[in-house]
Structure formats: C-alpha cells, structure tokens
Amino acid sequence: MDSGTSVVSISADILRPPVLTAAQTFGDNENECRVRLVLTAQQVQEWNLLPQDIQQEILKNGQVRVETYSSSNTARKIFICTSSVSNLASSIPALIKVVTPTKEEDASLNINLAVSSLILGSKVLIHQNLIPSLFSVSNSTKLLYSASLLPRSSERLVTLETNEIDASVVIETLLKYILSRISFIPRVSVVPYIPDAAYGIYGSPSTFTQFNHMSSMVTPENPYGIPPIALTSAGGNPDPLRTTQVFPHSGPSIPLNIAATQVVSQKMSVPSSLLDQLYHAMPHKLMEISQNTNANITVEESDSNSNEKFISVVGTSEANQSALMQLYAALISLGRK
C-alpha cells in the first residue's frame, strides 16, 4: 500500500494559545484520554513514510485518533492521540518504536509527552506517588521532566525512558496517575504547548494571566520559564527556546561570543489592559527601562479593539534580557497592589 498519514491537521492560533481546563486537555475518564506526544521532525517524517496499512494497524484501525497542529515549526510536532487508556498504552509505544531508528541491541524507548505542571504535581508528589508506581511495574524505567516550562505554555516536557517489554504497562500507569490527579483538579487552567516558528515572541496573554507571580517556576529573572539562552539564539534558530533537559539544541544559532555584541530583536506579548495600567501608574516606566538597559523599547501599533499588544525590544542579548526582566517585574507588580 502507498505511504501516507493517518494524522489529521488542525489549526491553532500560535500567538494566542487557548486556556483549557485539565479535563479538556487530557480527558477525565479511562474510556477517552488525550495524550500529547512531542515528536522531532525526523520522527514525523518516518511516520509519514510508513505505508497506510501499518499506520492503521498501530492506530488500531481508527480506534486511536491522531491530530497535529498546523504550524511551520520544523523542529518539533505535537501528536494529540485520543482513545481509551488501554488502546493508548499499546499504540503509543508501537508508534514511537517505528519512528525512532534504534540499534538491534538497544531495545529502549524514549516517549516524550507534554503535560501540565499542575496536573503532574509537585516534585514531592511525583517522588512519593508517581515514581514508586512506575517502579513497581518496571524497575528499569526512568522519568525525566524539563526544568522549565515549554514555550508560551504551562506544560513541561515529560520523558519516559523504558524498555519495549514494559512500555505499555508504564504508559498505562502514567495515564492512570494523571487521571487520578485530574479527578481532584478537573477545572484547573492549562495553557497547552503549541510548537510554532514565532520564536521571537516572549510570553503571551494566556500565560501572563495564568502564571502566579509567586510561582517558583516563573520569576522576574526567568519570565514564562524561558531561560536566557532564548535571547542569545533568537536570530536564526527555528526553535531556540531551549527549555528542556531532554531535547538537544538543534538548528543554527548565534554563537555566544558573537551574540554578546550582535543586535537582536524580541517582542513581549502582554494584555492591552495590563499595559494601560502601566501607563497610568508609571507613565515613564518604558523610557526609564530603555535608558537603564540601553535597549530600544517601543509599543507596536495594533487594532484598538485588540486585547493584546506587543512591546518590541531591540538591543544586545544582555540588554534585551535585562529589559525584559524589568518589564516583566513592572507589569506583574501591578497585580500585587
């Protein structure tokens, strides 16, 4: 049979990620769950080259539905897999196996998922509940998760390192753990990760309104969980937001020794109402930050009815990082008064 794809492409507003409930993002029962697989471009290509009958066999002849976001990102893709827990537990390892070239002696699988930090739970909860549960079904399985949030989202990258034999029961254990968490917090807000090529945008109104300024994950020094390397590589990398300990930094980027003096552009996306509050409370704040950091700061013209504005910051990577830190601190401080 000819090669093809059983994946349905869906549209998404990449600059304004939706805010969903935990139940909307993942599901709330074992009969229908949504798992968000994070795949590399090579893995997607391998999937698309598979004959249609093999794809259908892996997806249990339509019992497992797969959707992906339409985007120009060439580095990462999200496969949203929807089915029962039992179907997903067998289909996901099979899918990862066929799209990941491995040596014969290497029977391990790395399964990458995007999962909300709040659904996943605290480090204490993970170590007291999830990891012992995984270890009880497979003592060779490792659970890794990204130190910071995926770009413009409230999700982390979660990686399961397991062997082919145990992969299905490991996935089933993880999915049941997530369902048990959602039963307690079904309406908690989630900003899902949508891979895109709009890498110059720093944050979004969705994340701005969802992240509490007291959260240890998001601070003025690291707004939205994006590390400073995002600025130094903002010139040519299609996916420069190096927010994970698992994925390697791929694609061209500005060498750090050049980035120190090279001028780069960044945009900070903020709610219009919040920027209006800043103008009212501190009318000269943007000029003050610009002078303090030696970065050029302007507010782009936008539709008067838009609920979003873009603050453009132009300067060296160091100047931009300092300016964005101060902008974030000024904006978030308005919510404390």
From Swiss-Prot:
Keyword annotations of the record: Cytoplasm, mRNA processing, mRNA splicing, Nucleus, Ribonucleoprotein, RNA-binding, Spliceosome
Disulfide linkage: none
One Gene Ontology term, aspect cellular component: spliceosomal complex
InterPro entries tied to this protein: KH_dom_type_1_sf
Subcellular location: Cytoplasm; Nucleus
Primary location recorded for the protein, binned into one broad class: cytoplasm
Annotated Gene3D superfamilies: K Homology domain, type 1
Superkingdom as given in the UniProt entry: Eukaryota
GO molecular function, a single term: mRNA binding
Domain KH: 263-327
GO terms classed as biological process: mRNA 5'-splice site recognition; regulation of gene expression; regulation of RNA metabolic process
Assembly notes: Component of the U1 snRNP particle, a subcomplex of the spliceosome.
Biological function: Component of the U1 snRNP particle, which recognizes and binds the 5'-splice site of pre-mRNA. Together with other non-snRNP factors, U1 snRNP forms the spliceosomal commitment complex, that targets pre-mRNA to the splicing pathway.
Protein name as it appears in the record: U1 snRNP-associated protein usp108
Taxonomic lineage from the root: Eukaryota, Fungi, Dikarya, Ascomycota, Taphrinomycotina
